[in-house]
Amino acid sequence: MSYFDISGAVFNNQLRELETSDPAHADVFNAVFRQLINNDVALMEAASMFAGEKNKQAEFILNLKRTGKKYGVHHSAFDVSPLSAGTRTLDAVGMVAQPSTNTVRGRNDFEGESVFYGLEVNGHVDDAGEFIVEYIKGIDNEFSRTERDTWMLYLTQWINITIDANGESLVISDEHHAGFFPEGAAIRTDQTVRPFVAQAKYMAGNGSDGKAASISGVNAAHDQSHNGMITRFKAKGTQYCGTTAQDKNHMDNLFEVAFATRDSQSIMSGCTGYYNRFYATVVENNVERIIISKSDANNLVVGSTVSIGNATALSGSNPTDDRGNAGLHAKANRVIITKIEDYDSNNSAVYVDNGGTKFSTGSTMVGSTEVKTTIVTMPWHTGACDNVLGSCGSPNSNTSGKDPYILFGVEMFLGFYEVISNVILKISNHVMTACICYDCTKLATSVTSDYVECGYSIADTQESWKYISELGYDPENPSVRHGTKVAASSSTGYADGQYTNKLDQTSDGLREWLSGGYLSSWSLAGRWCAYLAAGLGYSWWSFAARLSASGRCAKAAA
């Protein structure tokens, strides 16, 4: 930008001069504008000068990222090659994607380009289901991650999927090429296509009004269920719902193309192996810390979330470690570890932010059994990844199993299953199929005429975890994908687990879609992990969701 003065009217006049002197050559101006892309100050300055209304400003910025390129990946069919790694195709050939941390920025050639670029904004969904931008990060001083719903905006994905005996090829682009279709989240109810789609940046906590909110620095609301979410999210407005299949599919496409593997945990594992309980070794009073052995403390991560308390029930003869037990949270409920320091040669002090409320780390009794004060790991607060240096990555380690991650700006895998709001799994005559509703105002606690059944059967895993080797695909409902074959392992195929009832022995019924895994899923977890054996009203401490802006869509574009 050494050739442009980007200050106020000077920058404005220079670009206007170019525009008026040669109005017929848009390609020239696009080339100039694209040089702004790597200069955030200039980019935001240009947006505010050339577009007044916020949605137009957002479109202006996103359109500068438009390349028209086709980014692809090919994966062999499992019986051709069980390898999880794919082969980059078309314009993705030669590109590199590496996740970052808070201290190391990985190389990511996709970052900031085309459909992979995310614009961070505050906004809301209007009554018609359209996303309205309120404030844009970098332009508006009013922008806030903590006080207003925060979203990532992306250019609409145009998708081409080819599946044959050799495998599956996925191609995404920011332009409509022959044979491509728009992603589900972008299709309006009138079948026109939105220029961009919005993804909630954070799992949904509660805002100051007590309603679902996509904000940083809070506990995501837990104990969610398919049925419970209908009520919870509609309290914000009938145009809202929890995470949709379209939301999930959007992010899955970005991951699969950018990182060219189906084994998502090999790149970023998320908080999927951080299920710990440690006992106090020294009793203290009037403190906001707990003393535990050094070896135990070495397993904990500063910045992560824990609870401190005494179990009020036993599991066999021992105190329960089920996080659903209220006693485990009675002294410090889902609080952040602020520091860990040596206490003596054998023990460490783990400090937490309990808002100034002090507690004792003494024992209690359950019957005749002594129950020591314990510290248990819990899902992270939202905003845990706010300091990651790139658009993808984890705070400390991408593959330890202890950290959540962001994927092109969207934070996920805090330690919760993510409940999908607009899909119901139906068991009929011992066969499970997925049914999707494209209008969140019509979400129901049963499969009604507003739901569309997908055209494939889901693999019966016989009440055991099995690893997905092939996902079903219905071109009429392309956002909904579940395992139809489960012959893989933790390091082959999709490398993610799927769980169903014994369908051959199960009566007709309905199940919710729990996606991704939780604190204790370990190698079963990942982008395609699915627990499909819980009823629609079943909730648990490890179930959460995010706001969706794609609740009101059509099945297909005109």
What are these regions (language model features)?
Residues 54-153, 161, 300, 350, ...:
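GGW-centered surface loops in extracellular recognition modules
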Residues 101, 143, 149-191, 196, ...:
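Carbohydrate-recognition beta-sandwich/jelly-roll modules
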